[in-house]
Each structure stands twice: as C-alpha cells, then as structure tokens.
Amino acid sequence: MGVLSRTPTPIDADRPAAADLLRVVAAWAVATFHIWQQSWFSLGSDHWQRAGSIGVDLLVMLSAFCLFLPWANARQRGEPLPSCRPADFYRRRAARLLPAYYANLLASFLIALKRHGWNRALGLDLAAHLTLTQQLFPRSYIGTLLNGVTWTLTVFALFYLVFPLLAPLCAKHPLPTVGALCLVQAGYSQWALHQYGTGEYALLFNQFPAFCGVLAVGMAAALIFAELAHGSWTVRFAPRAACTALGVAAFVWLDRCMRLQAWAAEYQQFQLINRMPLALAAAAMLVCFGLGLTLPRPVRRVLSWLAALSYSFYLWHQMLAVFLKYDLHLPAWSGDTPPNQLGDTAWMRQAHALYWTAAIAVTLAAYYGVEKPIAKRLHGKKG
C-alpha cells in the first residue's frame, strides 16, 4: 500500500508527512538565499535563491498549523480539547527551542568576541538574545553582532506566549478568532507600508503583528485538514489522487509567489504585500498533499529525519557561511574585495559547495551532539 495503491493508506491526521515536506522546503529556501548571498553561485532556480528568505513566512504558518492540529482534531472528533496550562506549554516549548539555540548563541558570541572584543553593545546584544527579545531592539535586530537569523525566534516566542489563549478561542470560535488575527495583520501592514522609504520600515515589516494573519492561515488550515481527513471519502483512490494533483497546483501557485517576490522592484515593500498570498499557497499545498496519496514509508522516514534536522540547520547555516568567508577566508582569497564580487565563477562554485557541506556537517553534529541528547533527557524519549 502506498502512493500508487488503489486502496490508499489511511491519512495520518495527527502528523501528516506534508508538514515535514513543507518544513524541509522552507528551511532549504532560507538556506539557499543566505548561501547565495555569500557565494553568488546560481543553481538555475534564481527566484528561489533571491526570494528564499520568505521561507521564514512558511515556517511561521507551519508552526501554527502543527501546534493547533491537536486542537483541530479534538474539535472534529468531539473529544475534550487538549489541556493547555500556560506553565506546562511554555516549559515544553522552552525545552524544544532553547538548548540548540543557546548552543548556537554561545558559538555566535565567541565569534563576535573575537571580532569586536567585549563592549557594552555586545553585552546588550547578548542580553536581548538570551531573552529572545532581540527583534524588539534595533541594535540586536538589524544591527546585531550575533547570529542574524535568530530574530525569527522573537516572533515564535510571542506566538507561544499567546497560544494558550488563542488555541481554545480558535477551537470554540474559529471564524472570529481567525478574522481578528487577519485584521491585526492587515491593519498593521497598512500602517507599516506607509513608513516605507523611511529608516523605520526595515524594523517594522517582520514584527509579530505582521505575521498574525499568517498564523491565522496556519490555524485555519489545521481546522480544514482535520475536518476533511476523517471523512469516508479518504478510502477511495480517485479523490485522494485529486488532492495530490491539487497539491501540485498549489505548489505551482507558491512558485509563482516566489517569482513575483524575487523580481519585485521594491523587495521589502512587496514582501509585506505578498505575505498572505504566499501563506495561503503554502497552506493549500500543505492541506492538499496531507489529504492526498500517502508517500511510501521510506520516503516518509527520510522527510521526518530531514524535518528533525531543520531547526539546527536553520540556526547554523548562515553564520557558518559568513564565518568561513570573512573570518577564515575560505575558499582561499585575499585582498579587500571577495572573489564573488570580482566575477570569479570558480570561487563561487567552490564557496557554494563548501558552505553547504559545512552547514550540513555542523547541523548533524549539533543535532546528534546537542539537540537530540538534551531532548531525550528532558522528555524521556528513546531512539
């Protein structure tokens, strides 16, 4: 029984493989963008390289989907809603995010200390990062001396802060809750767009309110998926195959959103305008593939493994590329101008290969040396 079976494998309503697929695609897109920034090596998919930074938007939507899915399933099955005591929820989220993050932050701090020496600015930067508030202060956000990609953790932390309130509200009153979140993003985005062209806009367009609608899309996608995943139609091949085809169509839509973003004349301005279409395309892809034909078990296992690595990979890839290029001058170069800016295509190719290899190697070391052992200790998990 598998992807070509006339009697499809039952839908996994609790952990759809489509969520792992989207997580891997989003993490790859972000890394493709950051490594391309350093190497300038073209993969032939220029729009994904140029617009890959908005993979963050996909990760935000996906986080809302995955966290809310147990609530959506309980609502659909008529079961009691999951317990969500804030203290327990915050403890679980901290155990999931902080060990790998603090290990990465230590490395980032040591690199910054070597580059700049100890000073008050670095101390304040470190304090903001330790408390996950780095995005709230310009010096520790766009002016950080530490790992620049971790601003997203402020967005996630603020979402986790309100999730124990949002989850029961959305389960009991989905339309008003989703609508209110979308209105928050729409109102904030309109205000922020009026700041475009000023120095303030760069600080505004990725703040938490600018993602509230994206979070709403993720929670709505969980409700739709849960509603459809338990129907009698799921045992029939034709509708499941049709869902897979719709998932492919949604990916084409997502790819078009990426193309529009990549070639936008005003990239950051359009990023805020394009955020909801992008989130909707990704959510459609997530739901349709989740309801579609089940992937073979070996493929699902590989996707699950890659998805498990994605957090450490996200934390390490960009700072490693910058460290190798500017601190170690690898691949070897001299002078004040990096070879990619001089059109050295051989160096670009070598840099691209080196930065990806280093990111994957350090990700494996961080995951198996830090993230997984600590998770086993904190959660009592095996294997």
Segments and roles (model prediction):
Residues 25-34, 174-194, 243-252:
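Small-polar-interrupted transmembrane alpha-helices in polytopic inner-membrane proteins
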Residues 70, 83-91, 97-155, 186-202, ...:
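Membrane-interface helix-loop-helix regions
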Residues 26-29, 33-36, 62-65, 128, ...:
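Membrane-embedded alpha-helical transmembrane segments of multi-pass integral membrane proteins
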Residues 28, 102, 106-110, 114, ...:
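Generic alpha-helical transmembrane segments of integral inner-membrane proteins
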Residues 20, 24-27, 56-57, 63, ...:
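Residues within membrane-spanning alpha-helices of integral membrane proteins
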Residues 2-18, 32-52, 68-84, 138-141, ...:
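Alpha-helical transmembrane segments in multi-pass integral membrane proteins
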Residues 21-27, 63, 93, 99-102, ...:
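Conserved beta-strand->loop/alpha-helix structural units within folded catalytic cores of enzymes
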